[in-house]
Amino acid sequence: MQSNLSQQKENTTTVKEKTVQIQVEQSSYDVVIIGAGAAGLSAALGLVKSEEYKALKSQGKQPKILVICKLQALRSHTGSAEGGIAASLGNIEKDCWQWHYYDTVHGGDWLSDQDAAKMLAKEARDTVIELEHFGVAFSRTEDGHINQRFFGGHTADFGQQPIRRAAYAADRIGHQILYSLWQKCIEENIKIEEDIYVTDLAINHKSNSVEGIIALNEKSGKVEKICARNVLIATGGAGRLF
């Protein structure tokens, strides 16, 4: 018994804790947008044309906007969309935003944010026209209008019959939208950083507010703290952050 105890004592090794210091690079922006798909790029462009942004510019100030993505920007999953973008243009048959609104809420099993669904349906027409101005090459009717086709869940008269509502660009609508938004962001000198993997939000627990993000720069291998007055999460559905 004693020999076993002494043997165990001899085999015991003391492990000392070692503190590893990680160098964290820090930068600061007015707005950081996480995600460079259609939502993130659209948000950046929306900020640029906002009255607040223009007012700051008129005062000689340059608001700093940063869009970050974990891959190359044009590899966003937005580019995989094929069917079309819903908008009550009425180019093929009579349509209205109220029908589009109903279909959106109904398609979401009545769980959707109905205020957001109403805004989406009402503004879809102007959004499609704006995308056309950005350079999206929509498929056309013989008389030159944006073409539309049937797509699942699009109905007339509040669910009574199918309707052609999806504006499309052959089978590459997502690709067209993504590239056009990206090009517009480049024209507006919006900064886009690639290969940045967000690991956490920087939270001030005293004020219970978000002050930026913590991220891993996969190119340099360094951890970065990016401070921001505003953080917008536009990461799509895959991460399930919704």
Task: Give the ranges of each region predicted by the language model.
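Hydrophobic/aromatic ligand-binding patch that stacks against planar heteroaromatic rings
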Residues: 46, 77, 231
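Core beta-strand elements of the Rossmann-like FAD/NAD(P) dinucleotide-binding domain
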Residues: 26-29, 220-230
